[in-house]
Structure formats: structure tokens, C-alpha cells
Amino acid sequence: MEATKKLNGKAVTKWLSNNAIIMMMLAITLIVGIMHPNFFSGTNMINLFKNVSIRYIIALGISGCLITTGNDLSAGRLAGFAACLACIFAQTEGASGKFYPNMHTMPTLVVFILVIAICAIIGLCNGLVVSYLKVQPFIATLGMQQVVYGICLVYTGGTPIGSLNKNFTSLASNTIIGIPVLIWIALVVAVCFWFLYNKTRHGKYMYAIGGNEAAAEVAGVNVHATKIRIYILASCMFGLAGCLLAAKSGGASVNTAMGYELDAIAACTIGGVSTTGGVGTVPGVLVGVLVFELMKVALQFMNVNSSYTYIVQGLVIIVAVAIDIRKYLAKK
């Protein structure tokens, strides 16, 4: 009986330790919700989940990289580049300051396909550099981050792009059975990722590489091809998120989505995706993104200066990764 109590006590302590950040953030959110009833209002929650939807898609893209002990620091800049491209392709005809005055406005579906295809090429470059040139993902994607930002600056001249077609922007405002289309898109993406991670050979290979890359290669896993697919898929998600962000904002600039990669990495880590590889789930990523976004909105309701918000976010990232490393060392 005493042994059972000790075991249960250890299990509870371990659970609290592993989920300390989530519990702390939820507690802060609850307190803010009690102090400010508008926090849990329908309008605020809808806006929150719209933001979560876009962040979730980016985090899902990065999750595959993290599970294979990699990373993708080009996420934010690539999403911003995608947003700028989407805005250029979706600008209304005859708009003042139109990027390409003689270009017809493209259909929304064509805009998405074209932007995602361009991002896929960038993801292919990342995958090739990481898998074949053996460059550390951190360095490879950091370099690509700067390359993409530079291309975006040269291409747009640093000029904000707006005057978008209503068919394109309505994607962010339309609803299906009362639920915003953005949320439906994120749900469809999440279901596809869950199936990919849990029911396909690619998912099994991905977790095997994250657990022990050398052993996976000996077992016959094509490590190079798997990693390339992961980085291509990640970039496609950044492209999709960039298009949705452009539709939601009604425009874009070179600074759109800046820093989103750090938020996504933090959300993944909070949601149980291990930076040491081999561990991570699609629902866990959703929990991480939701908790992280709730914290940011709660800080805004508390009238915390935006400068201090960055400090809090940075501390959360450090603590989340530290806890993840601690769990990894405990297993060893």
C-alpha cells in the first residue's frame, strides 16, 4: 500500500514537473479571465483561435524538423516572404501602387498553389544542405533565413503591399457553420499531419531517425530522403501560413511574421516535442501553441508593456528547453 502511494506520488510529481509551464500559464490565464471578463468573450476567443490557427500550421511544419533533432529558423522569414508573394499575386487590378501594373489578379487557389510551390523549392534547398552537405540544421536554416529576407527586400524594395482582391481577403473573414475558415484549414492540416505522423511509413521513419539516426540507417531507413521530405513539407506549411496571414492582415511587408519561428519552437517544446528528437505529437503541438498564445493575450489584458512581453516569451523558451533537456538526461 505504501509502495503504491509512493509510486503515485512520484507519478504526480513527475507530471507536475513536466507540465509546470503549461500549468503556470493556464493559472495566469484563469486569473486574468476572472479580473477581465472580456478576456473570455466570444469575439476575443475567435480572434485568439484565428491567430492560433496560423501559428499552429507553422509549428506543425517545424515539429517534424525538431523530431528528427533538426530545426528550421527560416520559418518566420519564409512565411513573411510567402505573404508578400501572395499579396503581389492577389492585388486588385488598377490599384494605386500595384506591384505589377499589367498583371491580372490571380484566382485565390492559384495564388496558394504558386506560393506554396515556391516555398517548397526553398525547403528542398534546406533539405539538401542538411542531409547531403551535413550542415547543422541550425546553421543551414539560419543562413536560409538571411537569404530569404534579402530576396524579399530586393524583390519588394521594402515597400508594404496592400489593395488585395476581396476574394482573397474574404478567406480570413468567412465562416462555415459559424466557425472561421482559418480554423477549418488548421484542423484539416492537423488531421493530415496526425495521419502522416502515426499511420504512414514516413512518420515511422521520422521518429526512428529522431530516436537514433545511425540505427535507423542500419535498419534500412533512407535518412536523406526522409529529411528532405520533412524540410520541404515544413516550407510548404510556412508558405500556407504566409498566404493565410496575408489574407487575414489585408497586406504584408518584409517584416511580416518576423520571429514566428521562435514562438513556434517554444510552442512545440511546451507541447511535448523534444528538441533532442524522437518525441512529439500533433495534439501536443496544439496545446503548446494555444497555451503560448493565451499567455501573450493575457499579458496584453494586464497592460504589460510589449517590451516586457518579449522578455517573458524569451524566458519561457529558455525554461521550456531546459525542462526538455532535463527530461532527456533523466531518461539516460
Region roles according to the model:
Residues 94-145, 287-288:
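Alpha-helical transmembrane segments within multi-pass membrane transporters and channels
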Residues 2-60, 95-110:
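Membrane-interfacial amphipathic/re-entrant helices at transmembrane-helix boundaries
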Residues 133, 137-200, 226-229, 247-258, ...:
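Transmembrane helix-bundle core of multi-pass membrane transporters
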Residues 1-24, 28, 218, 222-225, ...:
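Cytosolic-side transmembrane-helix boundaries in multi-pass membrane proteins
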Residues 37-51, 153, 197, 203, ...:
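Inter-helical junctions in multi-pass inner-membrane proteins, predominant
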Residues 31-35, 39-93, 128-135, 272-282, ...:
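Single transmembrane alpha-helix segments in multi-pass membrane proteins
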Residues 107-115, 122-126, 178-252:
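Helix-loop-helix "hairpin" substructures at the membrane interface of multi-pass membrane proteins
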Residues 238, 248-314:
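Transmembrane alpha-helical segments in multi-pass inner-membrane proteins
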